[in-house]
């Protein structure tokens, strides 16, 4: 009986593994799970003794490996989930993570995540609008504290100090906050109220003590190398223009966002995604120049391919703005213009930079933000019903979540405001701590790669002086 039970378990395991191999893209993870499961099954055969204990022992062992055909459907699902979880933890050390990280390749050279303590003299100060965002200041502060421990940065946290301390104590962050203040890695800078999400951007001119203005002044006076805000993006743009000014020759700054592509190590920079809803051909030409510098410096692409978002590949396609912009980009010799980019090609990896007006870009951005959740829901609804579907769901759960993460805006953190005299990172209004950490990594990388130095070189180009 002992031998028969062991044979049945082994057969069940093999059937599950064969089914998974036919339906999963990550076959190396499955191989690891299968080896673990078969080994555990053999151990189970030696441990199980006595007819009366066969079923219970088999249930305990199989619950940690790959399946128990003796138990109910719920036990089968739990078993499959445990196998995938075990395999995933093993795979983390042997396979490249599937989560999209636009600056993943830069982490080694930047030393962003280092086990060695970086002295304060070598850390970069970043000003943070602690009051900007739907849920500020708690998730902003939590993200800043997390980023300080992971990256060689210090934070000037701008906000109403009394409120920041009260909220930190309420959520249990006060001890960590005081520790970082004592270590001179975080400084609280007092300010007035933030510019509300529903307020006009021009409010920054009247309220000089607004948190975004105070943060921007820190960059202006060189007390910080970059600024981050998850508040009113229009107010951030207005404050940047009024406080630190535009780059010489740039008519309008643009918001550049990194989108995932088929190659998770090579994202595409799309700009503008919301700063300028109405654009001239000269604006888009300048966006291409800005994006080209960013792709070279931060993304480390030697010869970025620039695309113009349009409804067709042909030169004659599109509206008046597209046709005139195409002509300007085609005549530009300082970058590699790859022609029109249709909507279906944005995430293909064929282009490194895609330019468009802010109205179109913002729609594209918001659409992409919804894709991850919708895709996951569709895949779940298409799985078979019953026992087989539940087992399949358990096997695919971790993979589906990784797909969702690759398309989740929280994983990307923020977008750069390009075209002003400083590094400004704009966060999503609903940013949580994970988004803040990602955005601060983006700010650090931009500073570390001397983006501003090279952007300032653009004014030497004839096109910006004409």
From Swiss-Prot:
Pathway: Lipid metabolism; phospholipid metabolism. Residues 123-466 are annotated as: Phosphate acyltransferase. It is an enzyme of class 2 (transferase). It catalyses: a fatty acyl-[ACP] + phosphate = an acyl phosphate + holo-[ACP]. Pfam families: FA_synthesis. Its EC number is 2.3.1.274. Gene3D superfamilies: Isopropylmalate Dehydrogenase. Keywords: Cytoplasm, Lipid biosynthesis, Lipid metabolism, Phospholipid biosynthesis, Phospholipid metabolism, Transferase. Its main location: cytoplasm. One of its GO terms (cellular component) is cytoplasm. GO terms for molecular function: phosphate:acyl-[acyl carrier protein] acyltransferase activity. GO terms for biological process: fatty acid biosynthetic process; phospholipid biosynthetic process. Residues 1-122 are annotated as: Unknown. It is found in: Cytoplasm. Belongs to the PlsX family. Catalyzes the reversible formation of acyl-phosphate (acyl-PO(4)) from acyl-[acyl-carrier-protein] (acyl-ACP). This enzyme utilizes acyl-ACP as fatty acyl donor, but not acyl-CoA. Homodimer. Probably interacts with PlsY. This is Phosphate acyltransferase. It comes from Prochlorococcus marinus subsp. pastoris (strain CCMP1986 / NIES-2087 / MED4).
């Amino acid at each position: 009986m002992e031998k028969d039970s062991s044979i049945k378990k082994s057969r069940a395991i093999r059937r599950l593994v064969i089914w998974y191999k036919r339906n999963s893209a990550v076959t190396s993870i499955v191989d690891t799970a299968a080896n673990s499961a078969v080994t555990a099954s053999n151990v189970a055969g030696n441990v199980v003794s006595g007819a009366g204990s066969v079923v219970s022992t088999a249930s305990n062992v199989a619950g940690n490996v790959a399946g128990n055909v003796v138990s109910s459907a719920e036990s089968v699902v739990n078993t499959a989930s445990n196998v995938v979880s075990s395999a995933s933890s093993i795979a983390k050390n042997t396979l490249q993570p599937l989560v999209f990280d636009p600056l993943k390749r830069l982490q080694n050279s930047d030393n962003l995540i280092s086990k060695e303590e970086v002295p304060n003299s070598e850390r970069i100060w970043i000003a943070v609008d602690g009051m900007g965002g739907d849920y500020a200041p708690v998730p902003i502060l939590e993200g800043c504290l997390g980023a300080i421990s992971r990256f060689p940065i210090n934070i000037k946290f701008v906000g109403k100090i009394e409120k920041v301390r009260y909220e930190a104590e309420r959520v249990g962050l006060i001890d960590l906050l005081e520790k970082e203040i004592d270590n001179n890695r975080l400084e609280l800078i007092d300010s007035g109220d933030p510019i509300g999400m529903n307020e006009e951007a021009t409010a920054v001119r009247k309220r000089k003590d607004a948190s975004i203005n105070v943060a921007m002044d820190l960059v202006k006076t060189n007390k910080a190398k970059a600024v981050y805000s998850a508040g009113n993006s229009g107010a951030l743009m207005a404050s940047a223009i009024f406080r630190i000014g535009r780059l010489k020759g740039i008519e309008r700054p643009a918001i550049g966002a990194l989108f995932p592509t088929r190659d998770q190590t090579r994202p595409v920079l799309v700009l503008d995604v919301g700063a300028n809803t109405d654009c001239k051909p000269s604006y888009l030409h300048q966006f291409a120049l800005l994006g080209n510098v960013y792709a070279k410096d931060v993304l480390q692409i030697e010869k970025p391919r620039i695309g113009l978002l349009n409804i067709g590949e042909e030169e004659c396609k599109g509206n008046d703005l597209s046709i005139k912009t195409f002509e300007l980009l085609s005549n530009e010799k300082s970058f590699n213009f790859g022609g029109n980019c249709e909507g279906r090609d944005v995430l293909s990896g064929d282009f490194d930079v895609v330019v468009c007006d802010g109205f179109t870009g913002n729609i594209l951005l918001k659409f992409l933000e919804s894709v991850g959740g919708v895709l996951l829901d569709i895949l779940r609804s298409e799985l078979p019903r019953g026992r087989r579907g539940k087992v399949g769901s358990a096997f695919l759960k971790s993979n589906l979540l990784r797909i969702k993460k690759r398309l989740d805006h929280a994983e990307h953190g923020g977008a750069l405001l390009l075209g002003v005299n400083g590094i400004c990172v704009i966060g999503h209004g609903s940013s949580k701590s994970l988004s803040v950490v990602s955005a601060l990594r983006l700010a650090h990388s931009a500073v570390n790669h001397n983006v501003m130095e090279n952007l300032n070189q653009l004014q030497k180009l004839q096109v910006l002086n004409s």
